[in-house]
């Protein structure tokens, strides 16, 4: 699958996770509704599904990975930033096939597209601190 299709999968995952985080609906329902309503012809749908289910299933674990590196309480984190960080931390901790720098750079780009004005700097700061602990020898 092309890198652009994976990038689109991540973009879609941010949107779907944002919806899930706010609605607290079942993740399978969020996935179904998202795929039914969005144009996903240029999306790696299998990767989108993996990100969505992986982040939802491991959200407590992923939140635990980010907490020590947050400059504020987890509850004060914006929903977009939380979704972006969860995706990156999922890729870093559960997807060894995704290079270290790719996971971080993709998260920064997602934060630029979907986040508040300086959220990409915040995301970069958190991942810069967390990533070496998650993948100590796999930069």
Curated annotation (Swiss-Prot):
Keyword Transcription among record annotations: yes
Any one of the GO CC terms: cytosol
Cytoplasm as UniProt keyword: no
Gene Ontology molecular function: RNA binding
BP GO terms, sorted: DNA-templated transcription termination; transcription antitermination
UniProt entry keywords in alphabetical sequence: RNA-binding, Transcription, Transcription antitermination, Transcription regulation
A Pfam entry, by short name: NusB
Protein role: Involved in transcription antitermination. Required for transcription of ribosomal RNA (rRNA) genes. Binds specifically to the boxA antiterminator sequence of the ribosomal RNA (rrn) operons.
Family matches, as NCBIfam families: nusB (TIGR01951)
Family: Belongs to the NusB family.
The name this protein goes by in its record: Transcription antitermination protein NusB
Gene of this entry: nusB
């Amino acid at each position: 699958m092309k890198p652009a299709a994976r990038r689109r999968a991540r973009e879609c995952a941010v949107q779907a996770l944002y919806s899930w985080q706010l609605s607290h609906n079942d993740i399978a329902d969020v996935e179904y509704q998202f795929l039914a309503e969005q144009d996903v012809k240029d999306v790696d749908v299998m990767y989108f599904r993996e990100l969505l289910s992986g982040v939802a299933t491991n959200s407590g674990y992923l939140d635990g990975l980010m907490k020590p590196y947050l400059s504020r309480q987890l509850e004060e984190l914006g929903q977009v930033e939380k979704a972006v960080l969860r995706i990156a931390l999922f890729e870093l901790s559960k997807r060894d096939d995704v290079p270290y720098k790719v996971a971080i750079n993709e998260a920064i780009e997602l934060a630029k597209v979907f986040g508040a004005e300086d959220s990409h700097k915040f995301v970069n700061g958190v991942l810069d601190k967390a990533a070496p602990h998650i993948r100590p020898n796999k930069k």
